[in-house]
Amino acid sequence: MLTLYKFALEPIAELSGDPGSYGFRHDRSAEKAALRLMDECAHDDEFVWVLKADIHSCFDSIAHKWLLSHIPMDKQMLSRFLSCGYIDKNRKYPLRRGIPQGGSLSSLLCNMTLDGLEDYLHEVCGEN
């Protein structure tokens, strides 16, 4: 069922997604990111800033409240996905924050959460 929601959300995420974001996106890869970077640098006589980011505990830090208010999908289904938790040694642990890594929606929800970061960095740091 969640995979169907993923298929429904993917076109929305692609339209609203940051153009410079290459992680967990259809038809994007590290190789394509490197090619775009080389192309950007080849046509510019000025210095170009490059940001490679690894957001520490990104999946574990995403607030459920934010997701429920910003992700355009059935709120009850999203809430169930977010609260499913995990099982370790026959004991269930609920999630109060973050999204389950490896879930069919997880990488898409992470990307949708980070959308806007590229524009914010351009605004704060300048266009280049």
Where in this protein do the model-derived segments appear?
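Charged boundary/loop elements
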Residues: 7, 11-20
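Conserved polymerase palm-domain catalytic core
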Residues: 19-20, 35-128
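Basic- and aromatic-enriched surface patches that contact anionic nucleotides/nucleic acids
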Residues: 23
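Active/ligand-binding-proximal structured segments within catalytic/core domains
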Residues: 1-9, 110
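Duplex nucleic acid-engaging cores and interfaces of nucleic-acid transaction enzymes
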Residues: 1-2, 30, 34, 38
